[in-house]
């Protein structure tokens, strides 16, 4: 199950999360999660705004993430956003437990 964060702002609930497509979109725009600790201010704003794209794209157009950031974010959210951002990549390397359709491979060096 995909990890999400649900927030309420101005009496409206928003679901934040990432998909392969939204991570790809952020990478194409120049975001690199490996630089998050070197550029924390930019990274938290980019991650927070990007987390709206999967479920709440209209909110980004209406500048809702910017309004929320101006009011402040919980410190713990930075780590959770990074964890959620990495989830689609981790999912690529997981295979189903039933064995059906799983890739079989062998490396020779």
Residue ranges and their predicted role:
Residues 1-9, 13, 24, 29-38, ...:
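Charged interaction scaffolds used for protein-protein
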Residues 17-18:
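Short linear motifs in exposed loops
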Residues 43-54, 83:
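Short, hydrophobic/amphipathic alpha-helical patches that form generic packing surfaces
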């Amino acid at each position: 199950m995909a990890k999400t964060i649900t927030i309420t702002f101005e009496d409206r609930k928003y679901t934040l999360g990432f998909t392969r497509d939204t991570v790809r979109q952020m990478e194409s725009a120049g975001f690199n999660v490996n630089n998050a600790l070197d550029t924390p201010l930019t990274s938290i704003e980019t991650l927070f705004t990007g987390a709206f794209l999967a479920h709440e794209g209209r909110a980004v157009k209406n500048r809702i993430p910017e309004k929320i950031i101006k009011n402040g974010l919980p410190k713990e959210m930075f780590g959770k956003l990074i964890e959620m951002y990495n989830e689609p990549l981790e999912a690529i390397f997981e295979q189903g437990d039933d064995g059906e359709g799983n890739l079989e491979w062998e490396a020779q060096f």
